[in-house]
Amino acid sequence: MSQLEPRQQAFRNAMAHLSAAVNVITSNGPAGRCGITATAVCSVTDSPPTLMLCINRNSEMNTVFKANGRLCVNVLSGEHEEVARHFAGMTEVPMERRFALHDWREGLAGLPVLHGALANLQGRIAEVQEIGTHSVLLLELEDIQVLEQGDGLVYFSRSFHRLQCPRRAA
């Protein structure tokens, strides 16, 4: 791995202070079934519902995602830190085994959908732009499933943290 320039390191350190929801992006199709943990996910518009995802161009998943053309963004709950670690490659668990360890269901076009996630957002890649080290994917959503409540999982200061959902007063 090459040495980072001071500005690159400063940027990475600054981004470590940006709390972000933890997601596992999954795909299935002719190029295979896979997934990756990602925090670079944000909404673009609700007309039509569209997300923006940023995936490192050196990631094996980048090629698979583009070839399959369909993705599911699984917004992880506070109970899913182990799932996040597996799909981030922090464990030695091989890809196919990762899907066997947790409650994955089949969604549109066979997309892996994590049961119990705070949200499952399934769609097709509508546009791709290459910017620096990353591919920016615009995902036009075709199916949206949302849990009514649950604790969130965020990544902050280079570690996972459970974010407690405010409880409604009785």
From Swiss-Prot:
<comment type="function">
    <text>Reductase component of the 4-hydroxyphenylacetate (HPA) 3-hydroxylase. Catalyzes the reduction of FAD by NADH. The reduced flavin is then transferred to the oxygenase component HpaB. Is also able to reduce FMN and riboflavin, but preferentially binds FAD. Has no activity with NADPH as the reductant.</text>
</comment>
<dbReference type="GO" id="GO:0010181">
    <property type="term" value="F:FMN binding"/>
</dbReference>
<dbReference type="GO" id="GO:0042537">
    <property type="term" value="P:benzene-containing compound metabolic process"/>
</dbReference>
<dbReference type="InterPro" id="IPR002563">
    <property type="entry name" value="Flavin_Rdtase-like_dom"/>
</dbReference>
<keyword id="KW-0058">Aromatic hydrocarbons catabolism</keyword>
<dbReference type="GO" id="GO:0036382">
    <property type="term" value="F:flavin reductase (NADH) activity"/>
</dbReference>
<comment type="similarity">
    <text>Belongs to the non-flavoprotein flavin reductase family. HpaC subfamily.</text>
</comment>
<keyword id="KW-0560">Oxidoreductase</keyword>
<keyword id="KW-0285">Flavoprotein</keyword>
<protein>
    <recommendedName>
        <fullName>4-hydroxyphenylacetate 3-monooxygenase reductase component</fullName>
        <ecNumber>1.5.1.37</ecNumber>
    </recommendedName>
</protein>
<dbReference type="GO" id="GO:0042602">
    <property type="term" value="F:riboflavin reductase (NADPH) activity"/>
</dbReference>
<dbReference type="InterPro" id="IPR050268">
    <property type="entry name" value="NADH-dep_flavin_reductase"/>
</dbReference>
<dbReference type="InterPro" id="IPR011982">
    <property type="entry name" value="HPA_mOase_red"/>
</dbReference>
<dbReference type="GO" id="GO:0006208">
    <property type="term" value="P:pyrimidine nucleobase catabolic process"/>
</dbReference>
<dbReference type="GO" id="GO:0016651">
    <property type="term" value="F:oxidoreductase activity, acting on NAD(P)H"/>
</dbReference>
<dbReference type="InterPro" id="IPR012349">
    <property type="entry name" value="Split_barrel_FMN-bd"/>
</dbReference>
<comment type="subunit">
    <text>Monomer. HPA 3-hydroxylase consists of a reductase component HpaC and an oxygenase component HpaB. Some form of interactions between the reductase and the oxygenase facilitate the transfer of FADH(-) to the oxygenase in P.aeruginosa, although interactions are not required in other species.</text>
</comment>
<keyword id="KW-0520">NAD</keyword>
<dbReference type="GO" id="GO:0050660">
    <property type="term" value="F:flavin adenine dinucleotide binding"/>
</dbReference>
<dbReference type="Pfam" id="PF01613">
    <property type="entry name" value="Flavin_Reduct"/>
</dbReference>
<keyword id="KW-0274">FAD</keyword>
<comment type="pathway">
    <text>Aromatic compound metabolism; 4-hydroxyphenylacetate degradation; pyruvate and succinate semialdehyde from 4-hydroxyphenylacetate: step 1/7.</text>
</comment>
<dbReference type="GO" id="GO:0051287">
    <property type="term" value="F:NAD binding"/>
</dbReference>
